[in-house]
């Protein structure tokens, strides 16, 4: 009887933990992205490996480099860069503009 109760409790904990897995629903404009680089921008900005990008007079967080969607896979690869949610992608997909940091 004791082993059945332990098994039931363990299964319940696993089910609750699986339901608590972070999701990417924190971003209303698309998937949460994992990007190699982020930088606060204001006016013309020089980005490592890309060159100068004119963002006008906006003061915004930009993400650039290798950006890929963060997938909520239990035990999957972790983001080694910065997780961000961006309003749009500009400059032929090289730079994501209007980003905010996201805790995943």
Swiss-Prot record:
Q: What is its main location?
A: secreted
**Where does it localize?**
Secreted; Secreted, Cell wall
Signal peptide interval: 1-25
InterPro entries xrefs: Hydrophobin
Q: Which UniProt keywords apply?
A: Cell wall, Disulfide bond, Secreted, Signal
Family, per the entry? Belongs to the fungal hydrophobin family.
Q: How does it assemble?
A: Self-assembles to form functional amyloid fibrils called rodlets. Self-assembly into fibrillar rodlets occurs spontaneously at hydrophobic:hydrophilic interfaces and the rodlets further associate laterally to form amphipathic monolayers.
Q: What is this protein called?
A: Class I hydrophobin 12
Name its species.
Answer: Pleurotus ostreatus (strain PC15) (Oyster mushroom)
